[in-house]
């Protein structure tokens, strides 16, 4: 059975509002990560992929809450003839100030090539408890030499 290693480049664009009600803004986070990948391969481009990984992020705006954060994402997708339209998952951003923000996402694309999707910020901890927002993400897959893992520039 062929092992497929999916590597993700995510560029996150969003608008969001903060729990204090006084601040809102946009973010554009990028970084690098590693993902543990599980694959059930049925052949001819048909397979299911699940992943769990972490990434370190920076934002082009240094005062963004997502600048110098990390994220853990767990998700999955089903490929049919090499394409997917059902990617779903959830991420937890661990922020520099010790708080966390959670988002869920959906996506579509082509296995081994990349994809696009949308996300919704659903909640946070502490001062970000009521944070909300939506955004767009895109990625380009890269190759990894570690079996069962993928690496990414997010």
Can you annotate each of these PLM segments?
Residues 1-5:
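Positively charged n-region of N-terminal signal peptides that target proteins for export
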């Amino acid at each position: 059975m062929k092992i497929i290693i999916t590597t993700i480049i995510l560029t996150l664009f969003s608008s969001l509002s903060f729990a204090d009600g006084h601040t809102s803004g946009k973010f554009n986070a990028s970084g690098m990560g590693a993902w543990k990948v599980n694959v059930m391969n049925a052949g001819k481009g048909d397979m299911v992929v699940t992943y769990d990984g972490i990434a370190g992020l920076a934002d082009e705006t240094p005062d963004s809450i997502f600048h110098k954060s990390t994220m853990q994402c767990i998700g999955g997708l089903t490929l049919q003839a090499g394409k997917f339209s059902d990617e779903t998952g959830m991420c937890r951003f661990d922020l520099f100030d010790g708080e966390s923000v959670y988002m869920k996402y959906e996506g579509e694309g082509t296995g081994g090539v990349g994809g696009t999707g949308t996300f919704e910020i659903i909640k946070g901890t502490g001062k970000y408890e009521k944070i909300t927002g939506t955004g767009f993400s895109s990625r380009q897959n890269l190759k990894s030499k570690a079996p069962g893992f993928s690496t990414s520039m997010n």
